[in-house]
């Protein structure tokens, strides 16, 4: 941000973390989950981390590109998320790589981005749901639900969404649900719900009969 610098670092014999430097004050901003990802890197991989930043729609993001993923901090909400890109190889197989965007620049009323894979220039648009013709897949995991360690039933689950956002590229966007009953080690089959075609603003994403926890 204007008065703050974010960086990856750590003292001697300390594991790397993300820190915010504001004036003469340093504050750790990475969570335990982010620290766990950074601690798996070698010293050379930590040295090769590439940072970038940009602002859009009232949010200011700072990203750190790693070999297999990209860690992004939203300074407006103080929340983290990961970004990756899906690319189609010459064999037709779909591969997942670290977020391919490496640079941002605002010009002519648009936010332009650079591409680390083949050098193309793109535009970051919050109303576009593809990345270089590949559909963007977003994954969110909730905090574990528990009832004082006792089993419980989950008869009804609804995700509050902005519905009716389909467009020509994705006329019927979907949201899918998977449930883990063993702490995230295994997951149920996907159950899909429509987010709503363009104009279906009252569409709701509801899952019923979700079973019992063990």
Regions found by a protein language model. Name each.
Residues 2-6, 10-214:
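Beta-sheet repeat architectures centered on beta-propellers
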């Amino acid at each position: 941000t204007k008065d703050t610098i974010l960086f990856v670092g750590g003292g001697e014999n300390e594991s790397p973390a993300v820190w915010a430097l504001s004036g003469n004050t340093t504050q750790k901003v990475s969570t335990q989950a982010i620290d766990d990802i950074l601690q798996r890197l070698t010293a050379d991989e930590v040295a090769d981390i590439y940072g970038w930043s940009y602002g859009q729609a009232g949010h200011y993001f700072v990203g750190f590109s790693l070999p297999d993923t990209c860690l992004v901090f939203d300074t407006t909400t103080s929340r983290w998320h990961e970004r990756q890109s899906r690319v189609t190889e010459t064999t037709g197989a779909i591969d997942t790589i670290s977020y391919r965007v490496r640079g941002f620049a605002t010009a002519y009323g648009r936010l332009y981005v650079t591409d680390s894979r083949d050098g193309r220039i793109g535009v970051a648009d919050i109303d576009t749901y593809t990345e270089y013709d590949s559909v963007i897949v977003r994954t969110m995991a909730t905090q574990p639900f528990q009832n004082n360690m006792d089993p419980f039933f989950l008869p009804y689950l609804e995700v509050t969404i902005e519905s009716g956002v389909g467009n020509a590229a994705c006329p019927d966007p979907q949201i899918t649900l998977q449930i883990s009953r063993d702490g995230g080690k295994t997951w149920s089959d996907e159950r899909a719900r429509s987010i709503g075609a363009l104009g279906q603003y009252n569409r709701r994403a509801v899952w019923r009969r979700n079973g019992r926890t063990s």
